[in-house]
Each structure stands twice: as structure tokens, then as C-alpha cells.
Amino acid sequence: MARKSSILKVQGVVDAIRKQLDDRLAIDRRAMDVFRWALGCLLVLEFGGRMMVAEGLLSDQGVFPFEIWQTFPHATWPWFSSILALSSSTLWVHVCLSCGMVCSLMLIFGKQLRWVSWALLILLHSLQARNPWTNYAADKLLFLLLFWACFVFAVQPDENSRATRWMGFPAWGLRLQLCVLYLFSVARKSGSTWVEGSAVRYALEIDQYSQPLGKWLLEGPMIWLQMLTWITLLVEWFGPLMLLARSVRIRWMGVASLAFLQLGFLLTMDLGWFPWVCLLGLLPHVPLSHRKEEIQPLEMNVHAWGMSTRVAGWMVLWMLLWNLAMNFTYPDTLKSRLPSVLSRGIECLRMDQYWGMFSPNPMIHDGWFVIAATLSDGEVVDLLDPTRKEVWAKPLHVPATFPGDRWREFMMMLYDYPDQAHLWPLVAKWFQHRWEQAHPGQSGVRSMRVVYMMEKTLPEGVASPEKEQLWPEDPSGQGSSEPGDG
């Protein structure tokens, strides 16, 4: 009897704690509806945007053909986990992306949420797995938000239900995901630039990301940049904590502060989808319900989908423990100690999280690419950005030289992994083909070379750029002598 009484007491304490967390981490039903709509819109744009670069980055006609994908040593996920592996044609890629857009529209209109959300998750994984070097932090966060939403949609209330909040482990995961990103990211910002207040200045000097407004800020007093650095740290530390507060006013303060932080990123840096996905992740935190008499937890559907809820609970626990472990090690190190099946599983579910944006310090080496082509008439053009008159001069806006953020990410990853330099000829020939299509009847390309103009950010100013030739066409590796080659 004493043992049974002790078990009941422990169970009572656990239930009380869970009830408190349920109340604190519940999601307002109307906020969830807005989140679903925004998630669907973002996925429509994501699948549509990928369709624009499908031929170049996702098919055999581009820079990452199927035979390279099958043996790619830096693949995050096995090639056979993607339904895009069923065919290497551009048409099949377009069919899959079109299916993703249709499912995204169904998500927007709330049709068949339980199976549509999982179908979207499979399609999104297949897309991201097809060319892992086109993904960045925004893609992992988008996948994770959709992942948690799949569990939430499995516990959806009936149309006639008076329930106004979503409770349970699925809601916990969706609420905690963004908080985990901010808290563990800022915990790694321990470098000297963050302490002394120069981190924002170094970040804005990164040509691959900097926007005109960011360049303008660099011309202002250093005290501005120091204040922005410390404000960023404060918001990333206290913003997510305010999101977890019980007080509606404090939660609104957390939502507003983190939203303004992302708007600042949008105005000063070209980070692709990342600010938009972070803004999407804020929507489940919006507190809209005030009248307690209307609150009816979704317990009736939690029991109906008990297995799904329990799986979500274990995944929440894994997410927290994994991110805590990442303060002492790195994902690849820890995964190498796990059984391969478990390691592959957490990779496919994006549970091998590591949020290290601009940590411990922003990078100090950056620059821009030049695909220099000498035409048959002797003229030299940059195939990456043919509109530029001075091939070797620094572009006014480096992000605009790329056809899009996916190409920028792919080329930067290719630069970071010299063992894959054999892909540079495919990149050069792709841009040659694009240039010849846009300029029919003009002089043909006689020779090409891919050059990276590397700059180093110094404590004061920026060093002169250094040319680093990544791919010469001729066997000697010297490239051709061209005007402006200093």
C-alpha cells in the first residue's frame, strides 16, 4: 500500500507539472490557424522558387547530376530517401515540386490536414535531400516547424468543438523549437567580437550577405554598431524566455522584440528565407485567448491519437537533451558514437540540430566569385553576372551577382570543400550555356576560369582582395591571361 501511495504521489506531481506546462505552452487556436496559413504560403513559395532553379541544381542537366549525388561523400541524407531519386529528369523534379505546391494550397485551406501535412514533410525532405548543398539554416527550421505541425494537426479539434487552445506534447514542440534555436545560438556567441561589441560590424562586412543599408551602417560611428551588437545579444537571450512567460503582455513583448530583430536582419542582410521562417515560428506564440471560460483543452483528440502524442513527447525530450549536449560537442562527433540506424533517423528528422549562426564570431574571410570567360573576339565577361562592365572590380551588391540564394549557397559550399573541385567545370559550363542562350549570334566562349576574390576583414577596414583560382580550364592550371588580371 505504501508503495502504491508513493507511486500515486509521484504521478500526481508529474500530472501537476504537465498541467502547468500545458497551460504555459498551449497554442491559441486562432494563432494556429494563422500559422497554418502562413506555413502553407511559405511552402508554396519554397516549392515554386525551387522550380525556378530545378534544371540547374536538381537535375541531370545541371551541376549536380544523379551519378554524383549517389556517391556524394558530403550528403546529409542517403540519396534513396528522396522520391526525387525515382528519376533524374527535370520533368520529374517539376512534377514533385508541383505536388508540393498543391499540398501547400490544401494546407492553406485546411483540407485533409492529417495526411497533407505528412505528405508535405516527405516532399520537403525529398527536395532538401536532392542537393544538400543548396540548403541552409532556414531549410532545417522550416522542416522542423512543419514536423511539429504534423503532430499538432493529428490532434485537430472537431469543427463544432468549443476548444480554443491546442495542448499536449505536439504544442510543446512547436512552441519550444524557436526558443531552442535562439537560446542555444546565443549561448555559442562567446567570441571576443560579441564581448567587445564589434560582431555586427564583422557580420555586415560579409559581402555575400550585406545589403545597401548594412553597408550604410558601416559608415556610421562605431558606437552604433556596438549598441546593435549588444542589443542583438539581449534580444536573443531574453526574447525566447519572454515567449514562455504566462503573462500575455510579456509574451507580446517577446514576440515584438524578436520580430523587430528579424526585420532588422531583412533590411541589412540578405539571409534568404531565414528571417521569414523565424517570423513564421513566432506565430504559435501569439496569445489571443483571454476568456478562461472558453478554454477547453483538446483532451478528447489526444486520447484518440495517443501514440502520435507520445512520440511527440519523446521527440521534445530528445530535442532538449541533444541541444544541451551540443554545448560540449558537435553533431558529427556525437552521431559517430550512435548506432547507424539511429544516426540516420535523427538526420532525416532534422533532430541533429546545431544552431551556430555567427558564432562564436562572424567569419572574417569572404568575397565574391568571378566566372571569367574570354570570348573569341578577345572580350572578357563575367558569366556569373554578365551585366558588369569591370570584371575584376568589386560588385556594388554581391548577393545580386547570383541567380538566387540557392546558387549562392551551393557555390559557397563548393568553395569550402576543395575535394569536390571537380564540380567547378559543371558550374562554369552551366553559366556558359546560360550566357550563350541569352546572347545568340555573339562571339563564342574561347576559355573560362573560376576565380574567388577573397577579402579579409581586419580590426580596422578590409584588406585588398586576393585572387584564388578555383578551376582553370587548361591542364597547366594557370588559366588565360586576361585584362584586369592584377
Model feature map: region roles:
Residues 2-486:
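Alpha-helical membrane-anchoring segments
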